[in-house]
Amino acid sequence: VEWMELIAMQRGKRERDPGLIDALYAKDLARAKMLAAEGHVLVAARRLREMERTYEGLHDISAAREAADRIESGDRFRTQKKQLRRAMAYEARCLERQNSELAILRSSDVPPPTHQLAGTLQIRNLTRNAAKPGEEGLAAQRCLNSLYSTLAFYFPLVDLPKKRYAQVAVSYELANMVRDDNPVVWYNLACVRALLGRKNDAVRALARALEHGFNNSELLATDADLDSLRKREDFKVLMAERP
């Protein structure tokens, strides 16, 4: 809201309020300097350059410009900028690899084994890198987030109506390698495994769904996808032990 007010004043769509402009400028400058003091020099410099554009014609911007120049001339800024460029290149390679490997899953009548795709997608390496501090860790986490949303939601959304259950099962299995705490994904995996006749695996997936808090009693009792499991003792035990 404050930014919109400044832009409106800058464009002449609102009467200028010198007191408000001074207060907002001082607050934004203090925020940027605090970020720099905490070591976030890339973000601080970007905020200061944005201040130059936002306050141009409204306020003397020399303090913001000088602070940005000072930060950008420092070794820490150059180091972080180099790290950011490396991380962006890493992320681009990662997303390109994901697109290539997932295209194989989408186009195949018989999907590759889950463990094979997990290896070529480098899920283990991405998970390890996502735990690192700094830009590399953030880039790896973004790659994992993109991969997870594709596997857990978008691919099944397209493939389930086409009854491509084998492909959907692989999608959910890979999604659970990225993040294994979503009860709905485990439940959906149990359903497609049951539809594929993989009953033992289906019960195991259902157990994980319940373990992570799946509690839709009506769906568990009526979902036709699970009908092939209902006479099994291990299924009955799961239902009996459910909270």
Where would I find each of the regions flagged by the language model?
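TPR alpha-solenoid repeat register
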Residues: 60-64, 185, 219
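Alpha/beta-hydrolase-fold serine-hydrolase catalytic core, especially in secreted/extracellular enzymes
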Residues: 2-170
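Canonical positions in the second alpha-helix
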Residues: 51, 174-175, 208-209
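TPR/Sel1-like alpha-solenoid repeat signature
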Residues: 159, 171, 186-193, 205
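Canonical tetratricopeptide repeat
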Residues: 64-67, 188, 222-223
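Start-of-helix register in tetratricopeptide repeats
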Residues: 26, 150, 184, 218-219
